[in-house]
Structures are given as C-alpha cells and as structure tokens.
Amino acid sequence: MKLDKLFEKFLSLFKKETSELEDSDSTILRRSRSDRKKLAQVGPIRKFWRRYHLTKIILILGLSAGLLVGIYLFAVAKSTNVNDLQNALKTRTLIFDREEKEAGALSGQKGTYVELTDISKNLQNAVIATEDRSFYKNDGINYGRFFLAIVTAGRSGGGSTITQQLAKNAYLSQDQTVERKAKEFFLALELSKKYSKEQILTMYLNNAYFGNGVWGVEDASKKYFGVSASEVSLDQAATLAGMLKGPELYNPLNSVEDSTNRRDTVLQNMVAAGYIDKNQETEAAEVDMTSQLHDKYEGKISDYRYPSYFDAVVNEAVSKYNLTEEEIVNNGYRIYTELDQNYQANMQIVYENTSLFPRAEDGTFAQSGSVALEPKTGGVRGVVGQVADNDKTGFRNFNYATQSKRSPGSTIKPLVVYTPAVEAGWALNKQLDNHTMQYDSYKVDNYAGIKTSREVPMYQSLAESLNLPAVATVNDLGVDKAFEAGEKFGLNMEKVDRVLGVALGSGVETNPLQMAQAYAAFANEGLMPEAHFISRIENASGQVIASHKNSQKRVIDKSVADKMTSMMLGTFTNGTGISSSPADYVMAGKTGTTEAVFNPEYTSDQWVIGYTPDVVISHWLGFPTTDENHYLAGSTSNGAAHVFRNIANTILPYTPGSTFTVENAYKQNGIAPANTKRQVQTNDNSQTDDNLSDIRGRAQSLVDEASRAISDAKIKEKAQTIWDSIVNLFR
C-alpha cells in the first residue's frame, strides 16, 4: 500500500465523520416533542453527552490526532534517504588525507558484505520461514501483526517483517515503543518502493547481528561453522536463522542446548512453509551441534591507524555538521580531511617514546597534546591527543589537543599583552619596567630564578618571558585592551576576571588547537583562519552533504603581525625557547608555564608554540590533575621542550621550507643569537641525528603500511568483484 493512499483514507474518514456530525445537528432540530421528552428522561451525564455530541467530537479529535501523527511519520520517512542504504551497507566510511589518498576507515557494525547469490538457499529459506513467511507476498508490512504491536503499546514482539527489521536496524533504535513501531512502518513502505525483495533480503542478511561482535551472515558463518555463507548446511542455516531472535540467548557458543532447541524450531518452520520435507527436518535435527562448531573468523582489520586524528574528525562531524556517531560510522561516507600522513605518522612515533614524558612516583605518565596546523587555511595537518600508552586504546578517547581546558601561561602574552602594545605604536625596543611591583592587592614577580632589573626592551621581555614588564604593559594600556585582544584571537574571555593577572593567563582556559589557530594570525600576515579537520563529506552515493568553506578573519594588520614575528623569533634564538629550537630551521613562537598552586617551583602546565610561514606547532604537557603527587618539575625547557623539538625536527622537512621576510629583533638591535646546534643537542641526549633518522624511518613505515593495507584491500575487493562477474555469467 502506498503512503499517499493511506493519507487519502485518513482524509476521507475525517470528512465523513465531519459530515455526519453536521447531519446530526440538523436532525436534532427536527426532533418531535416526544423525542425531546424522552431525552429529558435520560440521566444528566448521558443527556449532556448526547446534547453536545461528545462521541463524535472525541472521534474527530482522535482522527485529527492520528492524521497529524501520520503526517509527521510520513515526513520522517520521506526525509530519510533510503536511496543510499544499499551503498552504505556495502561500504565502510573512508577517511582521506589532504591529497585525497585513502588514509583509513571506520568499521562500525559492518561485516563482510556478500550478494544474495553467495548466500546459501537454505539460509535464505530458514530466515524467511522464521522471520517473515509472507515476505515475497507482502508490501513490507504485516498489517495484522503490526496493529497488534500498536495496540499493546509496542510490547508485543513479532510484529515486524524482514523489511521492517531492516528499517529498524538501519535507521532506528531497538526500543519497544509505539513511536518506533510507527516510524518503522512508514520506513518499511519507503524501502519497499525503492528496492526489490532480493535487494531487501540481501541488505537484511548483511546487516543482521549474530552475537559475539559479528555482523552479517558471511562473518557469522565463518565465526560459528568455519565456512562461507554459500556453504552452510541445512542444520547450520537453521542455527544461524534461529539466532536472529536472540543473538546472545541462542548463540551456540553460549548455550548449545538453547541453540539446538531454537534450531529445531526453525526446521519445523521450514517444513510448515514448504521449504523442506519431514525427512530433511529429522536428518538435520539429529546433527550434533558441537561437532559443527569451528571458528575461522579473523575479525575486523583495523584501519584506525591515526587514532587522535580520526577521533577529532568524528568529533567535528558530530559537533559542526550535526551528524550522529552511528551515521558517521555506518553510512559508508567518504570523509576528506586536511590530514598530512607524514606529519601525523612522525608525531605519533614521537609520542610512542615515553621516555620523553615525565612520570609521577606512582607510575602515571604526564598527559600531552600537540597540533600541527597550516596557517593560511587553518587545516589541521596532524594531531596527537594522548601519550602513546593510551592513544591506541578505544574509540573517541579524550583528546588533550582539542578538548582540554588548560591555562595558557605565558603563551598568552603575545596575544593580550604585546599585540596591543605594538598596535598602540610601541617600538620593539621600548624600555619596559622590570622590577617587582604591587598593584593594590596584586603582587607580581618574575618566574623563580629570573632576575629583575630597572628596565628591559620589549623584544627581550617577550623572548625571555618576563612577567613584570608584561603586567606593567597591561596596566599601562588597560585591562580592557587585553580582553579585547583575547576575544579577537578567539579565546573565551567571558568568565575571566578582569584583573591584571590576565597578562599571565590567569583564569583563561584553552587547548593546543585553539592556541594554534590564534598564532596562525602571526604566520599569516594578520589573518586568522578557522581551524578544521574536515574539508568535505560525501555520502555513499558520492553527493556532498557537508563541506568546509575556508574563511579568514583579519585580527591584526600585517605590519603588526610582522613586528610580533620579529620579536618571537628571539624566543628560539635568545629566549626561553632555546632548548626547543629545531635544528636547521628558523621558528618564531613562545613558551609558557603555569606555576603549581602548592609550590611555585613546580608547574602544572608547560607549553611550546612555534611557527614558520608553513606550519604552526602547538604543544602542551601536564598531568590531568595537578597535586603534590602529580606535578611537573622545573620549567618548559626541562619538559615540553624535548617533545616539541622532536616533533618540529621530524615534520619540518615535509613543509615547503618557506622563510620569514622579517628580521629577528635581537639581530636588529645588534645582538647575536645565543643558541647553536651544538648547544641544543647537548641539552637532550635523545635529540641526535640517529634518533631523528629512526623516528622518520618508523614514521615512513607507518605511512607505507597504511598504503599497502589499503592497496591490498582494494585488490582483494576488485578481484572479488571480477570473480563474482565471472560466476554470474554461468548462472
């Protein structure tokens, strides 16, 4: 029955009842005196009921409500894209890198997809005889059983045809509710209009769950009997068909007795449906279940090679494009991203070296997050969101690079202190106060061990991360200027107290991704792009359903960006970033630390943010919760610097190698760089040419392994397609 005809019936019935009500109104006016006398003798409740025609009114209201619900469910069915279902079930969601090369896949609830010709006729018949005996005759709905389920408020089982079950498995939850049953009804009608019975049966058998994490008849046949779906015997087919009612309850690995009893019931159904005779039933029922069990299922091949990046892709698809996790994983999408596999692989290999990360006395590793972002487009080229021990476990782990809320420490100074100063016309060598000051109740000093002096030039104040000049600058320019700048650079300043401490990051919460986006403005001539992972998403039919539109926001003038870069070049040559400086590459940027509340000699957060015209690398290090047992010793140069330098040294060779057009502020003022390649290497034994070569080699192996696995899978898929075509020629 077509949906349009259903609504025609609703409307005709509605019109009929309305017409009858109008007729009854005219009739009562013509009643005789005796009729009215009889009416007067009726009880007051019945009299009231009859006088105002409440039966008719309730009936019309009920029909109206039913009509509205029907319209809503009709709209739900029409808005659901059933055209893509077959393609979505056949294919996995694939993730592509920025060069549109396949980088991995999301498996979801998918098994090995096979065509109906590769599924045993015994298995097809067993399923139809048990789940939907009128399958080839009905239009997707068993109306009697469906309305029984509706009357019992969804509590009555067995009301679903194979088509309805396919609709439920593909689009709906497993809840036994009237709403779900009604949606299932309309979706089943839509599926019946779009697909043939053979296509529906094929999709159902490939999308059904068979327990033990196994989906689809092909993988289920291998899991329980060690054969392909085309090779299952009659008794094996009956066992698999019986599992559909309760995959865990009738699972032969969980209970041979329950599974055997259920198998025998299916065999009886097949006799009743005329698919087999009594002798075949008896013979199949005598087969010992345990003798048939043989597991040859190899499990799913994991293509989740870049966990932190793929997690971030899924999170962005959910939060930005309003897709559900289930849709993303199971609908066979093609997700094109900004991923650079060379960046990502090298970053992951660096994080696997746990000796680079501090460890608490109880053995807990400090956590960390790093982002590599292209400053012109905002495309994230690589991200690692957890230390390697945790990064490979599970799906959608917490990502410290994109989801954490940490104090930025001194990395906020270029944003809220020195950018407003440069915009106000301050010269880079302007002398700033560098002596201990008391501002009402707020007293500030430089970080432990850093000397104070009467004055210091602004470029030195930034490079050496001096607190006193930074706070003095905000005091001179006004706290409001600092807040305006922070908001302009994309920081959330709404709940931050308007105090001078904002110059040091007080009250501000951020993460490496957000800071990378902010610093991109310095690398991109004052234009800040929108950080993003996804460039576009296509559905299983190749239609673009979501896409990123590159946008840049002018946050500062190019001249201001150039002057800021000139000062931040000094961070890595003469300032706090010397130990973070990569070999053979020039970077600008800033370091940052946050003092531990219980001891100012320890730190809660350590940051290094560095950039070239081609890439921004933002790195954070710290324990999830800082306390007397979990803290970082020393400053950034003792912790985060080692990880940052390894990342920079391994991914910078893959960048175009663009150079800055501005001169280091130290050099402008006649001061030679303090860092040398020799000094950098002697600060950390892990940073050797052999070590870098090993990291790059292992990273290349990871990329090559991904490429080979994808290539092998495509060859296997293509070979299967060719073979199926050859077989079909002789059918």
Swiss-Prot record:
Pfam families: Transgly (PF00912), Transpeptidase (PF00905). Residues 78-731 are extracellular. Optimal transglycosylase/glycosyltransferase (GT) activity in the presence of 30-40% dimethylsulfoxide and 0.002% Triton X-100. High GT activity in the presence of CHAPS, Triton X-100 and n-dodecyl-beta-D-maltopyranoside (DDM) detergents, and to a lesser extent in the presence of Cymal-5. GT activity is inhibited by moenomycin. 50% inhibition of the GT activity with 2.8 uM moenomycin. No effect on GT activity detected with 2.8 uM vancomycin, but complete inhibition with 28 uM vancomycin. No GT activity in the presence of n-octyl-beta-D-glucopyranoside, Cymal-3 and Cymal-4 detergents. Transglycosylase/glycosyltransferase (GT) domain of this protein may be an alternative target for the development of new inhibitors of S.pneumoniae as the beta-lactam antibiotics targeted against the transpeptidase domain of this protein have increasing resistance. It is a single-pass type II membrane protein. The chain crosses the membrane at residues 57-77. It is found in: Cell membrane; Secreted, Cell wall. Residues 301-731 are annotated as: Transpeptidase. One of its GO terms (biological process) is peptidoglycan biosynthetic process. It catalyses: Preferential cleavage: (Ac)2-L-Lys-D-Ala-|-D-Ala. Also transpeptidation of peptidyl-alanyl moieties that are N-acyl substituents of D-alanine; [GlcNAc-(1->4)-Mur2Ac(oyl-L-Ala-gamma-D-Glu-L-Lys-D-Ala-D-Ala)](n)-di-trans,octa-cis-undecaprenyl diphosphate + beta-D-GlcNAc-(1->4)-Mur2Ac(oyl-L-Ala-gamma-D-Glu-L-Lys-D-Ala-D-Ala)-di-trans,octa-cis-undecaprenyl diphosphate = [GlcNAc-(1->4)-Mur2Ac(oyl-L-Ala-gamma-D-Glu-L-Lys-D-Ala-D-Ala)](n+1)-di-trans,octa-cis-undecaprenyl diphosphate + di-trans,octa-cis-undecaprenyl diphosphate + H(+). Its EC number is 2.4.99.28, 3.4.16.4. Pathway: Cell wall biogenesis; peptidoglycan biosynthesis. Residues 676-690 have a biased composition (Polar residues). GO terms for molecular function: acyltransferase activity; penicillin binding; peptidoglycan glycosyltransferase activity; serine-type D-Ala-D-Ala carboxypeptidase activity. In the N-terminal section; belongs to the glycosyltransferase 51 family. In the C-terminal section; belongs to the transpeptidase family. This is Penicillin-binding protein 2a. It comes from Streptococcus pneumoniae (strain ATCC BAA-255 / R6). The gene is pbp2a.
